[in-house]
C-alpha cells in the first residue's frame, strides 16, 4: 500500500503557478497601518479563492497583499476590504487568539520550500498578534513567541495590517530563492474563509501542501549574528513564626541564551532556568483511568520541539519534555536543533537535574537525539534516541539510590504525506532498555488516513509491550493491542442556508496481547453545518470496559470497582455551537446515559458563552 501511495507524491506540486515576486524596498517603511507611497511599486497579491463555506468560487471579500524586504527583514501589508461601515468581529486581544472567533489575516511561510515546516504570523482586526511554528505539513504550535512588529489601522471600507518580521526571528538557508508562501483571511460577518493560493475546504489554510511560491529577486540577506541573552536574579526570604524557625534566604541566579549557529540551526543554552513566567496549565478534573497529558509551554523546549515531542502518537510518546525539571530543578541544558539542508533536520539535547534529598531523587542526566530525512514529495523518515542516566546513588546505601539507574528508548518512524495531502499516515517501531528487563519491550503502531471533500476514512492500530518503558515519555497504558477504524461522509446541500450534513462512525477496540477484548467504544454522530458556520451535532455511543485495575469512576466517593469487573452502558449526547456572528456566542453540550454503575445514570450538561466585540471602523 505504501509503495502505491508514494507514486502520488511525485505528481506536480500544487499551486506552483501562484507566484509572488518580492524585491527590495525602495525606501524606509514605517509600520503604522498606512499604505504609504513606497508600497505602490510592490506586486499585489489579490483575487483570493474561497475556502469555506465552499471552495468552488472566488472570495466575495477583497484582500490585497504586498511584500518587500530590506537588509534586516520582511515587510508585509494586508489590505482587508469590508462593506462600508461594517463592524469587525473580535473575541480577544490576547496573543495567539482563537482563529475561528476573530476577523483575522494570517501569513504562512515555508522558507525551505519543503512543504513540511515553516512559520506563521498574523493579527486579528484589533491588532492582537499571532505567531507560531508550522510542523507536519500544516499544524501550528502557537506556544512559540518571538520578536516582530505590526500595526492595524481602521478605515470605513477596510482594515489594514502592516508588519515587519526580522530575518533573525525566522530560520532559513542562505542562498534559497524559492520559498513557500500563503495568505489567509477570515471574515466572520461574511462567514467566509479565503486564501491566495487555493486550498480544498477539508484542509486548513495553513496546509503547506497548497502554498504559492515566494520568488526572491536575489538570495535573502544573511540574518547576521544572532545571540540573545536572558539573565535573571531571584531573591527572597521566608520565616515560619509559628514554628519559630530561622529565616531562610533565597538567592537564585540563572541564564538563558539563544545562539544562531547558522541561519537555520539554533543553539539553546540554559543554566539554572527560571520557569516562573510560563503560562499555567488549564485546570482539568481527571475522571479517566490514566494520566492526563498537558502540552509543553517552556520556551526552551518549543523551537523544533516537534522532532522530539511529536514522535509517535498522542498516547505513545517516547519523549515528553515535561518529565524534565518538574520534580527536580534543572542544573543546565543545551539543545542544538534545526535544518541542515532542505532534506535533513536534526536535534540534540542534553540536560541535567539536581539531586533532591527529601524525595530521594538522584542527579539525572537526560539526552535526546533526533534526525529526520525527507523522502518523496512531503514524507520523511525519522530516528529518535532517548536516554536517562542516574549519575549518583548507584550504591544501595546512598539515600538517593534507584533500582532503575537508566532507561533508554530508540525508535524509527515513517511519516507519509502525499503531495496533495489526501493521504497521510505514519508507522513507527520503538524498543526500550532498562535494568533487569528484557523481552516484550517493543512497541509498534501505524495509521493511514484518506481526506477528500466528501470522505474522511482512517485506520489506526497500536501494540505496546508489557515491559516497554519510557520513563522520559508519555505512555499511560501498556500491554495492549488496539484497532481504531473511522469513517465520515459529508453530504453537501443545495439549500442556501445549509452547507452540509455529516455522518461519522468510529470504533475503538483494546485487547490483551492474547487478543481478549478489554475495552470497546462504538460511536455514531450526525452533524448539521449551516452557511453561517453554526453547527448542531447529535450522537449515540456504546461502551464496554473490563477493568484491569481497581478504579473509582467518581474520583472522590471511594466507590472503587474491583479489578476484572465488566461494565457496559449506552449513552446519547448533543453539541450546539452558535454562529460566530452573534455578539453572544455559545457552546452547549450534553450527555445522558450509563456510566460504569448499573443502578446509576450519568447526566452532564456543559455550557460556555463568550462576548464577541464588534469594533466600528473609523477613518
Language-model regions, residue ranges each:
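Membrane-embedded beta-strand positions in outer-membrane beta-barrel channels/transporters
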Residues: 64, 104-106, 160, 228, ...
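Exposed, low-structure sequence patches enriched in small/polar residues
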Residues: 329-331, 337, 405-406, 420-604, ...
